[in-house]
């Protein structure tokens, strides 16, 4: 459980985070979304006690991060890339962290295994790819078997296989009852794993909602269907609440139903489908609309003041 | 995993592990005996009685290689703290030990004890080796002579304190080149510049600058016009305490 109470962070004249309050609950994945530079990393740094808030405070598991006797057991964090010494091996990096808490050596081997780094464990981190560096950061986050996991842009630099691995990992961590808080600037990626969303723009809270509500309100969730028999399928799918548009011949955008219903309907009537894709791009669009508004709003305010 | 807590002993284990798992530590520490013994032997081999170096203290003469050691342990001190900022490792370190100060104290303790041990071993090796070449000269001396052991041990203690001072500077400056710049500028070059000034009070103060105090500490026979061994050691300790205290205050306040 993470709680932010009116967090505010100012660097000189620049206010990066303003009066931010939210709660992240255990047992689900919570996405922390915002465009680049919206204050996500600063917020995470304040939660972890790396930066002191100008006002407000954050707690993890009921108290300030630094007040926990075993911080790594309370929160495991993937920080921005390169939070390590490039001259040290992956194994020694993790061992040094483990030693601060008396975490057994066997656990170091376990997280190396879990992140697929066992073979690279004794290589110096200098030679690691971006993806391997991310995996090592995730290994460090899991080292203390933490109740809460905080990951800053975990899919950055990962190959498609790695992205898939992260999705599964996040869901399984949440299923174990842990609090999982994942920042990202990609709505479509986040919507695949998260159930809850906290969206910020320019350091302010824009939305604290579920993915389901966000999708419904955004009007996203259209399904793209490519079929040689479009007219028939349109007739079969027509129902109250279902809207179908066909901008190009043979390609339908269906709103108001899901891929499962469309697929079954087509199969039942022997209609060939070339493509059946839930349209995540419109979700991305809704997210961009939401955050762009906040940026424009802020810009207008500044203009009015000047 | 029920007994997980951060304790001072565990932080010590972690910092000890960190120091020995990067190559630069091994390289730097290996250079200390190599350069000191090498310089000592070269001096011993080329020394002539009654020459220009006759009035140089015997310990200072044989340990002339400590000029290199000053730089080496200084760099090592800066790397220990500022290196974590340059690489970004500091974020991991401070997430594991969010109370922060135990990390600073532990780093200082680990670096001081390792420096002291390596330098003392080097000195106890260098002096007798150089003396085998100086046996028939006016610089002949043995470990049992008055002040010799005190100067050899004092030199090691002084260099350990210099390393801690550098570590404090590294933590304050948070940049390896910046830290090395401040170290050489303020500690090595500044006293030489100040000495040129025609004021006695400045001369008195310069005596207690780290490098000057270290020179004084390395004398078997205290020379007039330099600090006494006790005062020199105290001065070096105060430099270390002052920089480390400033580093601690800022470490607690600043964002990582």
Positions of predicted regions on the chain:
Chain A
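ABC transporter nucleotide-binding domains
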Residues: 2-195, 199-201
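Short alpha-helical
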Residues: 66, 85, 103, 188, ...
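Conserved NTP-handling cores and scaffolds of large molecular machines
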Residues: 101, 177, 218, 241, ...
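Short alpha-helix boundary/capping motifs
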Residues: 101-105, 163, 227, 255-257, ...
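A short linear hydrophobic-aromatic micro-motif
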Residues: 116, 241-245, 272-276
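ABC transporter nucleotide-binding domain
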Residues: 166-253, 257
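C-terminal coupling/interaction segments
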Residues: 255-306
């Amino acid at each position: 459980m993470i709680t932010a109470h009116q967090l505010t962070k100012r660097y000189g004249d620049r206010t990066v985070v303003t009066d931010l309050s939210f709660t992240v609950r255990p047992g689900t994945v919570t996405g922390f979304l915002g465009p680049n530079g919206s204050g996500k990393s600063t917020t995470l740094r304040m939660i972890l006690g790396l930066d002191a808030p100008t006002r407000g405070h954050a707690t993890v598991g009921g108290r300030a991060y630094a007040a926990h006797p075993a911080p790594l057991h309370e929160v495991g964090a993937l920080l921005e890339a390169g939070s390590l010494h490039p001259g040290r091996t992956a194994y020694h990096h993790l061992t040094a962290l483990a030693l601060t808490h008396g975490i057994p050596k066997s656990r170091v081997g376990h997280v190396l295994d879990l992140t697929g780094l066992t073979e690279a464990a004794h290589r110096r981190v200098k030679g690691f790819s971006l993806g391997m560096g991310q995996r090592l950061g995730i290994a460090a986050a899991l080292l203390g078997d933490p109740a809460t996991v905080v990951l800053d842009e975990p899919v950055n630099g990962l190959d498609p296989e790695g992205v898939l691995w992260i999705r599964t990992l996040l869901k399984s961590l949440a299923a174990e009852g842990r609090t999982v808080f994942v920042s990202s600037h990609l709505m479509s990626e986040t919507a695949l794993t998260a159930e809850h969303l906290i969206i910020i723009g320019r350091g302010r809270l824009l939305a604290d909602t579920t993915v389901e509500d966000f999708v419904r309100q955004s009007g996203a969730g259209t399904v793209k269907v490519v079929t040689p028999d479009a007219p028939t399928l349109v007739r079969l799918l027509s129902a109250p609440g279902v809207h179908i548009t066909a901008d190009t011949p043979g390609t339908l955008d269906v709103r108001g139903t899901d891929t499962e219903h469309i697929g079954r309907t087509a199969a039942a009537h022997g209609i060939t489908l070339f493509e059946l894709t839930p349209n995540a791009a419109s979700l991305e669009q809704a997210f961009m609309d939401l955050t762009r508004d906040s940026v424009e709003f802020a810009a207008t305010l500044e203009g009015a003041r000047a | 995993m029920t007994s997980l807590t951060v304790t001072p002993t565990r932080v010590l284990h972690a910092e000890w592990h960190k120091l020995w798992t990067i190559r630069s530590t091994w390289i730097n520490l290996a250079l200390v005996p190599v350069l000191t013994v090498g310089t000592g032997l070269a001096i011993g081999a080329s020394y002539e009685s009654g020459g220009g170096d006759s009035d140089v203290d015997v310990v200072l003469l044989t340990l002339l290689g400590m000029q290199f050691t000053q730089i080496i342990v200084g760099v090592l001190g800066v790397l220990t703290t500022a290196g974590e900022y340059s690489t970004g490792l500091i974020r991991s370190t401070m997430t594991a030990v969010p109370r922060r100060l135990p990390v600073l104290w532990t780093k200082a303790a680990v670096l001081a004890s390792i420096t002291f041990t390596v330098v003392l071993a080097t000195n106890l090796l260098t002096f007798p080796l150089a003396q085998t070449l100086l046996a028939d000269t006016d610089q002949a001396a043995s470990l049992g002579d008055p002040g010799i052991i005190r100067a050899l041990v004092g030199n090691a203690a002084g260099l350990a304190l210099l390393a801690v001072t550098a570590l404090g500077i590294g933590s304050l400056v948070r940049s390896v080149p910046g830290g090395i710049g401040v170290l050489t500028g303020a500690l090595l070059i500044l006293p030489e510049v100040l000495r040129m000034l025609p004021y006695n009070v400045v001369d008195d103060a310069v005596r207690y600058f780290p490098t000057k105090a270290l020179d004084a500490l390395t004398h078997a026979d205290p020379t007039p016009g330099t600090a006494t061994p006790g005062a020199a050691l105290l001065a070096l300790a105060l430099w270390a305490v002052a920089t480390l205290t400033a580093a601690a205050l800022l470490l607690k306040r600043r964002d990582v």
